[in-house]
Amino acid sequence: YQQLMRERSNKVKNHIAANHSEKVKHIISMVPDGGNYKDLPEEYKDSRNFHVAWTRFASDKPAPTIDTGHRHHFHYKYNRVPTVRECARLQSFPDDFIFLGNKTQQFRQVGNAVPPIMAECIAKQLKKYLGEN
């Protein structure tokens, strides 16, 4: 999969990590692999209005749905939210696809998109079906 995503690219774009404060990084560090805000000690649960959407990706399971928000999930390994490129990779965008606009707009483009590999599979099935009729 990684080789396929990197096939036509010699540089990774849209891969700038968020610059979280030390306090936020500390709070994120307390969320276990696959966990969410409910795993935080009580004194931290209201410190940044964490809610159920704040989850850490599980390192050994498929990622949850990527949506238009860019602060709903934490990276499975690093104490930060994923980059636009990491979300795009999960959505099957090849690394040579460049998202334009500010970071919020880029995350919105990724979250609103139909994953390219899924779109290709649907198109192949439609072509097959329409070719038969």
Set out the residue ranges of the language-model regions.
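C-terminal target-recognition/interaction regions appended to catalytic cores
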Residues: 1-133
